């Protein structure tokens, strides 16, 4: 037993917990509510305990008659889903006339809430005014009329339980009570619309007599048992709950309903009760709408949601038919269970039900449409993947792709409209799929654009490298201007080739930015790398002027050549190369940008001076070699003619014998012709050196004799500085286009040298060293043929020693 309303008229704070403990909150609408009213100490609580097994507090007879139940108490019957309300007794000494309003409020509460109102009366009090609760019954009738007027409620059912009955003819008791009720009804002022109504249009009266509990205990127990059956046995002829009352509200909202009802009654001293029918309708319609929604949710879960859990399954037309079937069933359930309530409440919760169904179903609808969206995306991906992976000249890649996007978008919109549920104006966000396809197009377009530009730039960079290397190899006065023109031309060709292809394949073609800067950075790296080999470039420029004629043939030194002038001009050619590479001038002369990396020092002053000193040491050997050749040529030219005549006359016999021998004659012609040709070409010394190299190699293979070893040690070559013959190591730099690979000395296009020129350079260095040794060991005044021959033999020994 729990108190729900205190004696002071306040709702208990834990009302929700009381209802929950009773279990009524889980009963839905499958329960009944019964209230009992009557005079104080008339045995109301005892009657409820005996009928339903409850434990309402009863009067202690040892303390005498006094108020036991204060306020309103509630408990659930043990033998059935019946919620019982034990109302504080009327006509109590404790309250007196000071607070008769509470009795009226509690009576109103019991009548408005309960399906069945039990009035507990003593048989001996029938016919009296206060003892028979005539004032309270009058209040009940007035309140019932107000409820009827406000909401056209059904009849209120009242059960009169007559206690301590002794009259054999119970009909007399019924007659007396009915007479009193009609008298009370006659005293009530009815509105014009109800003046033709009788009391029986508003109330159903039922009567039951119970014998004395103490004197007639056995009969009393039988009376209680019989009355209990009328409450719990649905098959009982006089079952009290045959008709479903509209006063029952869903158990889950009962506590809220009780609280709201009591607040209205308690705050309105004039008992201006609001529309209880509307309140009841709202509760009932809400319950029905919830049940209909649950039914709908369960059905669509089985027919739509579970099959759609597998993304590969497509319901097709079944989605729409299954959804509409579930909606129809839910609406029918709601209408069948709610049509009897007020139309305003029915329509309100019908709209709420439709909204709830729509809120649930739209997620399924979007999921269903997403299947078609995935199909569209798969088809688009397959289509775009099947196109060429690179732009073609004159192609229309973007136009073809955009046409496919438009086609798939229209198909998706049409499919989603066909799946739309009747009564709902949903719109599938197909723009997301369209955006996804457009993003994919842009992604492919960006990748292919970068690929196209990268390929064109790479091709043009190769051509640029060849031309730039040639310019760096020539290293003339116009080198920097030509490099700048080459950079601009290469950038323009790259951009033109790129735009020619891109303009027909992209909707909004835009030129790539930074092409000129990319070529400038790349050219700067090539120039820096080429500057590392400045010594070789200077030597190449010197040799090109000093060792070769203007027609490109090797120069054979004679006394007719102006050696000093040629040497100075050749040395100046080498120094010009150093000056060219000292400072980078890739930037335009009009570009005055401070700290421009295109205008930077390549070779510092200190390094430049060091290089120039090494260059002077390196080329002096070529000068000495040429000077020696001139001197030798002069000696050969000064042999007097008579000496040649005397030589031929004295050796005529030997010459004739030599010429008469075919073998010797052939060998003489062969070797003589070879010598003349090689000597004319200036390659005789080279041929002799090559022959000595082969001989020395054979000697090394067979093993040298001690004498040869001593000769080798004696004839060591004069040391040459390593920096004069060994090029600096290649460097590795990084550009926007990737690392510049290390390049070997013999790669001509990076350093401006050909392989042949490089080899000639090293040969010249060796020859120069040999001539230095020759100069140190022979005086300048030894200009005869013998000294020249001796120098040549000594030079041969030096070279053989060098090879060891």
Swiss-Prot record:
SUPFAM superfamilies: P-loop containing nucleoside triphosphate hydrolases (SSF52540)
Compositional bias per record (Basic residues), positions renumbered to this chain: 792-804
Xref: Gene3D superfamilies: P-loop containing nucleotide triphosphate hydrolases
Positions with a binding annotation for GTP: 38-45
Keyword Transmembrane applies: yes
GO CC annotation, single: endoplasmic reticulum membrane
Molecular function as annotated in GO: GTP binding; GTPase activity
Compartments in which it is found: Endoplasmic reticulum membrane
Lumenal domain ranges by topology: 660-662
Segments in the Cytoplasmic topological domain: 1-638, 684-804
Topological category with respect to the lipid bilayer: Multi-pass membrane protein
GB1/RHD3-type G domain residues: 28-245
Any one Gene Ontology BP term: endoplasmic reticulum membrane fusion
Membrane-crossing residue ranges in chain numbering: 639-659, 663-683
Keywords noted in UniProt: Endoplasmic reticulum, GTP-binding, Hydrolase, Membrane, Nucleotide-binding, Transmembrane, Transmembrane helix
HAMAP family: Sey1
Family per similarity comment: Belongs to the TRAFAC class dynamin-like GTPase superfamily. GB1/RHD3 GTPase family. RHD3 subfamily.
Functional description taken from the UniProt entry: Probable GTP-binding protein that may be involved in cell development.
Protein name as it appears in the record: Protein SEY1 homolog 1
Originating organism: Trichomonas vaginalis (strain ATCC PRA-98 / G3)
Lineage: Eukaryota, Metamonada, Parabasalia, Trichomonadida, Trichomonadidae
């Amino acid at each position: 037993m729990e108190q729900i309303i205190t004696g002071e008229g306040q709702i208990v704070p834990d009302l929700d917990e009381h209802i929950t403990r009773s279990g009524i909150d889980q009963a839905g609408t499958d329960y009944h509510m019964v209230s009992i009213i009557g005079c104080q100490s008339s045995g109301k609580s005892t009657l409820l305990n005996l009928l339903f097994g409850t434990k309402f507090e009863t009067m202690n007879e040892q303390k005498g008659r006094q108020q036991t139940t204060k306020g309103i108490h509630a408990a659930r019957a043990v033998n059935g889903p019946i919620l019982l309300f034990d109302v504080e007794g009327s006509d109590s000494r404790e309250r007196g006339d000071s607070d008769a309003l509470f009795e009226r409020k509690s009576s109103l509460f019991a009548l408005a809430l309960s399906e069945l109102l039990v009035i507990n009366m003593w048989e001996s009090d029938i016919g009296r005014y206060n003892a028979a609760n005539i004032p309270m019954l009058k209040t009940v009738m007035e309140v019932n009329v107000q409820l009827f007027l406000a909401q056209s409620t059904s009849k209120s059912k009242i059960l009169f339980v007559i206690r301590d009955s002794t009259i054999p003819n119970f009909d007399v008791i019924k007659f007396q009570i009915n007479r009193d009720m009609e008298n009370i009804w006659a005293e009530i002022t009815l509105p014009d619309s109800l003046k033709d109504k009788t009391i029986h249009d508003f109330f159903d009266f039922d009567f039951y007599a119970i014998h004395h509990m103490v004197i007639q205990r056995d009969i009393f127990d039988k009376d209680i048992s019989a009355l209990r059956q009328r409450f719990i046995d649905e098959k009982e002829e006089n079952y009290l709950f045959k008709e479903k009352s509209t006063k029952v509200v869903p158990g889950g909202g009962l506590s809220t309903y009780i609280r709201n009802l009591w607040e209205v009654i308690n705050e309105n001293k004039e008992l201006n009760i609001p529309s209880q029918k509307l309140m009841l309708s709202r509760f009932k319609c809400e319950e029905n709408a919830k049940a209909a929604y649950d039914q709908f949710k369960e059905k669509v879960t089985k027919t739509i949601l579970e099959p759609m859990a597998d993304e590969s399954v497509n319901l097709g037309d079944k989605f729409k038919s299954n959804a509409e079937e579930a909606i129809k069933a839910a609406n029918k359930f709601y209408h069948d269970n709610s049509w009897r309530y007020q139309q305003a409440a029915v329509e309100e919760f019908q709209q709420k039900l439709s909204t709830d169904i729509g809120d649930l179903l739209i997620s399924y609808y979007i999921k269903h449409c997403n299947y078609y969206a995935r199909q569209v995306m798969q088809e688009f991906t397959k289509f775009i993947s099947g196109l060429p992976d690179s732009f073609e000249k004159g192609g229309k890649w973007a136009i073809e792709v955009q046409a496919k996007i438009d086609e798939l978008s229209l198909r998706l919109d049409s499919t989603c409209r066909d799946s739309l549920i009747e009564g709902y104006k949903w719109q599938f966000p197909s723009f997301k799929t369209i955006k996804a396809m457009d993003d994919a197009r842009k992604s492919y377009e960006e990748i292919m654009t970068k690929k196209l530009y990268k390929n064109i730039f790479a091709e043009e960079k190769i051509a640029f490298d060849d031309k730039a290397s040639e310019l760096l190899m020539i290293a003339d006065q116009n080198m920097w201007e030509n490099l700048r023109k080459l950079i601009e031309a290469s950038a323009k060709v790259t951009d033109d080739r790129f735009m020619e292809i891109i303009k027909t394949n992209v909707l909004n073609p835009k030129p790539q930015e930074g092409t000129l800067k990319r070529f400038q950075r790349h050219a700067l790296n090539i120039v820096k790398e080429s500057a590392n080999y400045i010594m070789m470039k200077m030597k190449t420029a010197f040799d090109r002027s000093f060792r070769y004629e203007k027609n490109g043939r090797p120069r054979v030194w004679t006394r007719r050549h102006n050696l000093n002038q040629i040497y100075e001009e050749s040395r100046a050619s080498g120094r010009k190369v150093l000056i060219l590479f000292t400072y980078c001038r890739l930037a335009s002369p009009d570009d005055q940008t401070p700290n421009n990396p295109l205008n930077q020092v390549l070779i510092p002053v200190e390094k430049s001076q060091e290089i120039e000193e090494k260059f002077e040491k390196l080329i002096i050997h070529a000068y000495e070699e040429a000077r020696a050749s001139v001197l030798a040529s002069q000696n050969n030219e000064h042999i007097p003619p008579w000496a040649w005549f005397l030589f031929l006359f004295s050796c005529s016999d030997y010459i004739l014998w030599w010429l008469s021998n075919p073998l010797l004659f052939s060998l003489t012609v062969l070797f003589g012709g070879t010598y003349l040709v090689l000597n004319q070409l200036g390659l005789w010394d080279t041929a002799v050196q090559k022959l000595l190299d082969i001989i020395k190699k054979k000697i090394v293979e067979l093993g040298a004799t001690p004498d040869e070893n001593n000769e080798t040690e004696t004839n060591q070559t004069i040391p040459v500085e390593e920096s004069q013959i060994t090029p600096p190591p290649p460097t590795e730099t990084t550009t926007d286009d990737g690392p510049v690979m290390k390049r070997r000395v013999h790669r001509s296009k990076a350093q401006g040298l050909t392989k042949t020129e490089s080899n000639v350079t090293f040969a010249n260095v060796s020859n120069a060293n040999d001539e230095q040794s020759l100069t140190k060991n022979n005086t300048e005044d030894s200009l005869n043929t013998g000294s020249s021959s001796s120098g040549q033999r000594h030079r041969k020994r030096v070279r053989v020693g060098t090879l060891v």
